[in-house]
Structure formats: structure tokens, C-alpha cells
């Protein structure tokens, strides 16, 4: 449907019998009205043509081949000169065969049938509106018992009988005789109501505004009473208040959407278009049919049997009619939702039939797989991995995926730079992966964002924009801070990448969807780009260091081996294999790590600026080492102080690791960047 703003939308809800009839009925040019499916047949076993008034009837749903009727005659579609527009012999219109994808039919039910979604799904809408237990309504719907009291607002035999203050002795003999007379059928239809018809009458008598008002009054009265002191009674009152709130919300929803409650009971059953429940011929001449066709056949068989019983009601016992009504109700329940009442219906191979609910719901349903999960151009999919060196707004795009996504842009670049004379030559260069192709691709992606999406997209942050960079391999690299917004894990999750083509889409991606502009949760406002499991584990490994203390290094058995220590002299640092190295700056330490001279967790001594907290420390040195020139080293647990002969502090070294240095530098750069941003803002 299209709303007043010309937005296409799909809404699922209850519709009136008149609307179902308008969807399915159509008037042929000769004035004949078709649309009702009355026969449970599909194709004739000899001619392989659809049966008339069956589940694949061409009069109801349109021709199988465009412009060809059931008789084999052909007419040009859309030619106004061709007259008539339908075959007078078979009644099939000369229209496009695609009409069989949306033309519906209907089954006129011999008795009202409740929609199982509104009765059995929790919460039960019918039970909430009628304010009755679900078990009682189920017994009424499936004809397990009847209402032995008047349903309609009119004087009845049972109502008059209950108004007398005394019993007439003769009634003990007259009433049993009355039940055995021929007029009992009239009495039964008037005084006793059962099945979905009784539910429909009760729903039709409801006034939704009165229900809302009475429920609100009762809710206020329960709220004014206060706690009773009895835990069981308080819980009962709480459940009643919750029920009243749900009932008011449901009644308001019906009023707001102009839906009548009695529409939850079906009188006309829609029949899906044939192309949505096809019968396909496979190798060997065998036919494969949708399970919905078999469920429709079951409904039509039982409905036709009930119709025959009702036409011969004088000679048919009432119990037989009620039993057949129950079978019709169960058949419709199985069609709509197989297994909702317990044991699902199975075929001859013990395979469960797929009902209408099974077709549309779930990951492989019609909506998520076919309508929402369509394959689109300029998109790809791959596994995500951590990209720790990436900026927050960047993502690593594999080269092979990027060359496919941006192939048209690369072709345009090759032609504009006169590196290819036409599209064919440009595609040939791309297939051969010439070096110039990667240069042009690098220029293209610099100004073109991409969208990353992880299904299911449950909120706005499920799809975000990134600036791509080319990476090797086949996996998409992602900054770990954006993981929480996607609700993704780096354990094999896949994400889809899309290329926004129009200028409007690219502007929206840059202004609204970039990851560094979505740092807060749109739902509660809390920070969503926070360190999570992967980053915390990485920081732990980065800063864990070597657990051995400074004392343990002196008595390490490895130090007792007799071999000459290799000493490496440099202007920036002094390093020996057996002793912990000394560095003058963090850049020297990181350079030694890149040259693989030290490990990430290897302890080292780093020259540090004077710190008053260190000088004022009352810690007793573990060891004091004197040199020949009179200077000496005071060695503490995590730092050492070099003093002169006059006990002046010459320099300070702290005991740390390369991991700690890297972590400290990242924090320092972040603080400096924040301070610069604040200074620019002021």
C-alpha cells in the first residue's frame, strides 16, 4: 500500500470479509463473477491442464501462458482492436501470465472459523478482549462444549425459564420429549451457540470504547487499594492490573486502525496466487508441489463435506455437524500455522507440512530471505577480522572485493586517462591485474565511502559508513571499537559491504553514518564505542610484562653459564644478552623491538624525566652499585637513580617493558589530541 506521503509500505493485519471478496472476485466481460475456489483439484491427470474452479483455475487466477486461454486460442495482449478480451468458451481472459503472481481467490467457509494467530498465539487477542480464559474459549471453538445460555440480545426459552420462581413438575416430562422432536434444531440454533460462530457473536457485541473506559476504572480501583499483606493476593492483583493495561492498549489499537474485533473470525478464506505455491515438474515426469496446496485441498474437502451436511440438516444428527465444523477449524489452523495446537500434520513420508506461517517467518521465510534479503548490485560479503592499526572511521577492504565493487569507476578512470580506448580494453587490463589498475583503484576509493552492514540490522548502528583502504587477503578489517554497534564478534561473523552510488547517498554516509560520528547509543545515550573483550585481552597481553622481579634476575640459573657475554655498544642504548638493557628514549626501545633485539614483555631500563614523587619516596634501595668515578646507582624495585659524588641526581631510569611504553604513548597522544581539540573549540 502507499500512504499519503507516497511511501510504499506493507502492513499485516485483519481485514473484513468484504475486502477479501474485493481482492479475489473479478467480473468477466460477459458479466460472470469468478473468484471462489470450490474444487480441491489442481491439474487434470490426462491433459495436465488446471481444473476449472480448482486451486490453479485459469478463469480465477489468469492464464498460464500470456495471451493463451485454456482452449489454446491466442490474442495479442494490449491490442484494443482485438475483441473480445476473453475466451467465450472457457472464460479465460487474454492477459499477461504474470497476473498469476498477485491474483487471489477465496474459499467460502460453510461455518465461521477463528484465526489461530489471534486465538492461540500469546497473548491471545480474543481472550483479552472477551476477558475469558483461553481454555474456555478453545473448548468453545473446537465444539467441546456449548454455551447453554443466550448469546444474542433477545428473549429466549432459557431466559424465560430462568425467570420463574418455581419449577413446573410437568417440565420433567415435557422437555425430554421436546429434545426428540423435529423442532429441536430450531431450538438448538436459537438457544445454544457453539464453535467460532459463538465467538464471532460475542466479538460483534463488544463496544471497544466501553471496554477501555471500564478497564481504566477497574485499574484505578485496584491501584487505590494498596497492598493487602497477602503475597499471593498481591501477585494476583498485579497480574490483573497488567492484563487490564494490555486490554486497554489492544482496544485502542483496534479503534485507531479501524479494525472490527469480529474480523478475527474468518468467513472467507483467502487463497494465495498460484505462483506463490507452485507445482513444478522435475526429471522423470514427477511433480513437486508446495505443501500449502495439500493443506488447501484438505480445507476444501472438509468444507465441501460440511456444506453437504448442512444442506441435509434435517436427516443429519447435530453431533455430526459439530464434529465436521471442528474438522474444518482444525484444517484451517493447520493451513495457517501447522503444529500450533500440538502434534503437527505430516505427509506419507513422515515429513511435517510447511504451513503459511512457516513460509513467511524465520530466516528462510518470504520476508527475510526473498523481500528483505535480496542480492543487490555493488555489494559483497566477507568475514570480518580485527584491524588494530586502523583509524576508527576506516575499514580494510580486500583488494579482490574492491576491484569488483569499484570496477565501473576504474574503467572510467582508465578511459579518462587514455590508458584504454574502450570498455573492453579496460576490462582486459582489470582481468590481467596490471599495476596501473591498482593505482587508479587507490585514487577512486580515497573519495568514496562504503557501507558495512551486519544482519540482523536491529538498530541504526547496524549499518555504518567507513573510508576503505586496500588490504591483502580475503577478510574485511574492522576497528575493534565499532564491534559493539554491530553486535559482532571476530569469531567468524560475516558482514556485507555496499557502495553508495548517488551523491545524496554519499553525502548521507559522510554526514550521518560515519563510525566516528556514532559514538553514543541512539537508544540510551551511553557511549557505545568502548573497549570490549578483544581490546581488553590485547591490553592485558601488552602490559602483562615479565613476572620475574629484579631480585630473581640475579639468581637466575641461566646467568651462571660460563660464556662470554656479547656486548653491543650504541650511541643510544647499551644492551647485553644477560643483563637488562638501558635506553635513553622510548623511540630507541621501540626501534630495538622492531629489530627483534628485545621482546614485547622483556624488562628494560628507560631513562625518565625527574619526578618529585620518585625523589621523595622513602623506599629503601634493594642494591647500591658504585662506579670507579664515584657515581653510584641506587636500584629499587621498579626504578633506579644515578647519583653523583655529591649525591645529586644525575638521571632516573624506570623498569618497564615495550608493551607498557606503547600503551603509555597511545594514551599520551590521545590526551594531547583532546587538549588541542578543546583549545580549538575555545
Curated annotation (Swiss-Prot):
Any keyword Plastid?
yes
Where this protein primarily resides, as one coarse class? Answer: plastid
Q: According to its UniProt record, which reaction does this protein catalyse? A: RNA(n) + a ribonucleoside 5'-triphosphate = RNA(n+1) + diphosphate
Membrane-spanning parts: none
**One cellular component term from this protein's GO annotations in UniProt:** chloroplast
The positions annotated for binding Zn(2+) are 69, 71, 87, 90
Origin: domain of life: Eukaryota
Q: Which SUPFAM superfamilies match?
A: beta and beta-prime subunits of DNA dependent RNA-polymerase
Q: Which cofactor does it need?
A: Mg(2+); Zn(2+)
The UniProt annotation places Mg(2+) binding at 489, 491, 493
Cross-referenced Pfam families: RNA_pol_Rpb1_1 (PF04997), RNA_pol_Rpb1_2 (PF00623)
Q: What does this protein do?
A: DNA-dependent RNA polymerase catalyzes the transcription of DNA into RNA using the four ribonucleoside triphosphates as substrates.
Q: Which family does it belong to?
A: Belongs to the RNA polymerase beta' chain family. RpoC1 subfamily.
Instruction: State what protein this is by name.
Output: DNA-directed RNA polymerase subunit beta'
Native organism is Platanus occidentalis
